[in-house]
Swiss-Prot record:
Chief place of localization: nucleus
Cysteines joined through disulfide linkages: none
Keyword DNA damage assigned: yes
Transmembrane segment boundaries: none
Quaternary context: Forms a heterodimer with SLX1.
GO CC, one annotated term: Slx1-Slx4 complex
Subcellular location: Nucleus
Keywords of the record: DNA damage, DNA recombination, DNA repair, Nucleus, Phosphoprotein
Region (Disordered): 1-24, 38-65, 88-121, 139-202, 296-326, 362-392, 621-640, 668-689, 715-742
Family: Belongs to the SLX4 family.
Gene Ontology MF annotations: 5'-flap endonuclease activity
Protein name according to UniProt: Structure-specific endonuclease subunit SLX4
Length: 856
């Protein structure tokens, strides 16, 4: 440029005793303050490297001539200092060149002036211009006092508080130059003199660090939004290979600010915030605020975009899926037990959309929908209410006092699972009567009683408190009380005559077997049956039979006990009277069946059932003891009893297992002969007579079966089965069948058929307590045993409390030797009775013989 000119090489000798280089390049400075010295690369030597030039500038603050070595050649660059006095000097010095001899005095004088007046000092900037020249231009400075203090404090703060990577933001032109650095071209051997480098460093660091933004970034520690790239003070300088190298090496001194950052990385990361702002996020995809406002949910008639329609359809499908598990069947015991608590859980799991917007949506739907939709909704509402009515009842929370009172009245059942499983529910009789009535109405073969009473049993199970009744299932997995239909003797239903006689029946024998299978006789009777007469007969309902039977049980038993023939009564008189049955040793299911045999409703309490059975047994034994037992009765008295039975409402019937043989009023049956098997036993006829009556809905046996049921659990031996007077009236063993003579029925249970230990007593001598209660008293009254050699000897009661396995033989031996003696009991018990007692109390018991056999 035209502001400065570079003089030619001069051979001026050194002055003032200082030796300099052979070639000195004079620099002429323009007199105006805007002018700048221009250094042209006219020197034949190679230019100095940027690192060497930076070292010379930083190590010579006293304005001395620095020696620069480049490519083995020594060149001396004169350091020029432009002060305010020099810039504002007269135009005489405009074209004068500064030689090496005059450099030192001038520099010394100007240095003194600069130190004396800081306000007049200016800083020199090295700027790059397109071409191969360096421009040293002066720049007026601001007030140094305030600036110095501020920059030093900020510098200290930056070193003490900033821990991140901070770099100077460069202009796009500088970034391109930085990315592509051309090889350095030869520069002039004389470098410009720069003054006040320390102040320049502080000002550049202050402008490049950007402490305010860095502090904000440190506090937030989040990427800053994209903004205008700030320009650095050095951005005005144009590209030059030599000048560019000077700038880069000069900025290398501030490694703390440039550490970890580069211009290329900044350019690549610049467009990233734009993509993050415009791109979708997970929170924006959810958009939950539309569902919580009533205005966001529109009715089907309103126009809405397809996206909202799809979202509403998907939400409706989700609501329907939530409601489906509520309608699932109770297929497990756990689900049945927790059914009453599931109401609270379902309300907690409902969708919040339904709870918040249920009332508003209903109002909007009613106002905006047509009449046809309103009718459909009304029908849906009714169906929903009906469905909800069939659901589990709402359980109310009672006060604590009432809850404790209910606990006091609650009865606890102890025993094994098999014992509790056979318990009867409260609705047993009602179910049996309902099933029997439905079968009696039709003579066609109906479906089994299991499927007939399925709905009622399921409905009753919802309110039943017996958990064991819920364990019974049918083939479809539905809950069913199978025990009440299959195991209960009073619930046997047969609809057709052929099906009735296909049942296997058994009866007690007076011989040693106690059980006789009469399946063969039933087949012959079914073959000879007259179906026409069976259709003409009218049967009363099962409920009437039960009602009349319960009212006239004792009177009927008294009449039936008087029908014992001579041979049977004499045989019974020779035998010892049986003991009182041990009702305490029965299981809960056996006690319930005994109570049902007497005609009472099921009772939950075990103690009440035992006391009731004992009273019934005592009353029956007293009546049988007081009433006379004639050897025979005339047919007229028997006919009178039957007439009374018919007047009371009971239908006279006959059974294949009954010993009261009847004849048809229209046909006369052939007489059958009876072959005696033993002198003291009763014999069956080989030729079965034809019976014209129909099998009853429940099994009924002869009067003797009542005594079997009463004493079926006693261990004593002795039985009495009275026969009809026709057996003893003829000595040859022929049976007489009077006309219009029907039999009298008394119910029995399944225990009467399968039990082989039962005995029948005509009279009872003494009323003794049950062995079960006596065993309990003996075990509890055992005194404590002293320790033997420091080892405690627990009693039987303590062993039971500690859940130790009780050996049946040892406990029976102790009871017979000393246990019953503590309470004044003279009877003895065996291991079987002890086992029944243990099972009734839920005590763990083992057989001693089995343990010894396994050990060997």
């Amino acid at each position: 440029m035209d502001n400065a000119a570079i003089a030619s090489q001069s051979n001026t000798p050194p002055s003032n005793g200082r030796s300099s280089a052979r070639f000195v390049t004079p620099i002429s400075v323009h007199s105006s303050p805007i002018s700048a010295e221009v250094i042209e690369p006219s020197s034949p030597f190679s230019p100095p490297s940027p690192s060497t030039l930076l070292t010379s500038l930083s190590k010579s603050p006293s304005h001395k001539i620095s020696n620069l070595q480049m490519d083995g050649a020594k060149t001396t660059c004169l350091e020029v200092i432009q002060n305010s006095s020099l810039v504002v000097d007269s135009p005489k010095r405009q074209d004068k060149s500064i030689t090496g001899s005059k450099a030192k005095p001038a520099s010394t004088m100007r240095h003194g002036q600069r130190t004396a007046s800081h306000k007049m000092a200016t800083q020199t900037e090295i700027q790059t211009v397109d071409g191969d020249r360096l421009i040293v231009s002066p720049k007026t400075r601001k007030k140094k006092a305030a600036t110095a203090k501020r920059t030093r404090k900020q510098d200290g703060v930056a070193e003490r508080r900033l821990h991140g990577h901070v770099s100077k933001v460069k202009s796009p032109g500088d970034l391109k130059l930085d990315a592509k650095i051309p090889p350095s071209k030869p520069c002039d051997n004389k470098a410009p003199s720069v003054g006040d480098n320390t102040d320049n460093e502080l000002e550049r660091q202050t402008g490049g660090l950007q402490l305010e933004k860095a502090t904000k970034r440190r506090l937030d520690w989040t990427p800053t939004k994209e903004g205008p790239i700030p320009m650095v003070d050095l951005a005005e300088v144009h590209s030059s290979s030599c000048g560019k190298s000077v700038i880069r090496t000069h900025s290398a001194g501030t490694l703390l600010s440039n550490y970890g950052f580069s211009g290329v990385v900044n350019t690549s990361l610049a467009p990233m915030p734009e993509t993050c702002d415009n791109g979708p996020t997970t929170k924006r995809l959810m958009e939950l605020q539309n569902f919580y406002s009533a205005s966001g949910i529109q009715t089907p008639t309103e126009s809405r975009p397809a996206t909202n329609d799809s979202q509403s359809i998907s939400s409706k499908q989700q609501r329907v899926k939530v409601k489906k598990p509520q309608k699932a069947k109770l297929t497990t015991l756990t689900s049945y037990v927790t059914a009453k608590y599931s109401v609270v859980d379902q309300t907690a799991d409902l969708d919040r959309i339904e709870t918040v917007n249920s009332g508003k949506n209903k109002k909007m739907g009613v106002t905006k929908r047509t009449s046809g939709t309103e009718r459909a909704n009304a029908a849906r509402g009714k169906s929903d209410t009906l469905k909800n009515g069939n659901g589990p009842p709402v359980f109310k929370v009672v006060p604590p006092l009432e809850a404790f009172k209910s606990f006091d009245g609650q009865e606890l059942l102890f025993g094994t699972s098999s014992q509790l499983e056979h318990g009867h529910s409260e609705d047993q009789d009602e179910e049996i009567q309902h099933t029997a009535d439905s079968i009696n109405k039709s003579n066609v073969v109906p479906r089994p009683a299991v499927s007939k009473g399925l709905g009622s049993s399921l409905f009753r199970l919802s309110s039943s408190k017996n958990l064991w009744s819920a364990s019974s299932r049918d083939l479809t997995g539905a809950v069913l009380q199978v025990d009440e239909i299959d195991l209960s003797e009073r619930s046997i239903e047969v609809s057709t005559p052929a099906a009735k006689y296909k049942r296997k029946t058994g009866i007690r024998d007076l011989s040693g077997q106690n059980v006789i299978d009469v399946e063969k006789d039933t087949r012959t009777l079914a073959a000879n049956i007259d179906t026409r007469e069976l259709d003409n007969m009218n049967e009363p309902s099962l409920a009437e039979d039960d009602l009349v039977y319960r009212e006239n049980l004792e009177s009927t038993n008294a009449k039936l006990n008087s029908q014992t023939p001579a041979n049977i009564s004499e045989a019974m008189l020779e035998r010892p009277p049986p003991d009182k049955p041990i009702f305490g040793g029965f299981t809960t299911s056996e006690l319930a069946k005994q109570v049902a045999a007497y005609g009472f409703k099921p009772i939950k309490s075990r103690d009440k059932m035992i006391s009731l059975l004992e009273k019934c047994w005592e009353n029956q034994s007293k009546s049988s003891k007081l009433e006379p037992k004639p050897n025979q009765r005339n047919h007229k008295s028997q006919g009178d009893d039957l007439a009374e039975r018919q007047l009371l409402g009971l239908k006279p019937r006959s059974d294949s297992i009954s010993f009261v043989i009847t004849r048809s009023p229209k046909k006369r049956l052939a007489k059958t002969s009876v072959k005696s098997q033993e002198p003291k036993s009763f014999s069956l006829s080989n030729e079965g007579p034809r019976i014209t009556s129909k099998l009853p809905m429940k099994r009924f046996v002869s009067p003797c079966a009542i005594l079997i049921d009463d004493d079926q659990s006693s261990d004593s031996v002795g039985e009495a089965l009275p026969l009809s007077p026709s057996h003893s009236s003829n000595g040859n063993g022929t049976l007489h069948h009077p006309q219009d003579c029907d039999e009298i029925h008394a119910p029995t249970t399944q225990m009467a058929i399968r039990s082989a230990k039962s005995s029948i007593s005509v009279s009872s001598t003494t009323n003794l307590p049950s062995l079960s209660s006596q065993i309990t008293k003996a075990v509890q009254s055992q005194p404590r045993i002293r320790a033997f050699k420091g080892l405690k000897q627990p009693t039987w009661y303590e062993k039971i409390l500690m859940y130790d396995p009780i050996q049946l033989e040892d406990l029976a031996a102790w009871l017979n030797t000393g246990g019953f003696g503590l309470i004044g009991e003279d009877r003895e018990v065996g291991a079987g009775v002890v086992r029944e007692w243990c099972e009734s109390k839920g005590i763990c018991c083992v057989w001693k013989k089995q343990a010894s056999a396994k050990s060997h």
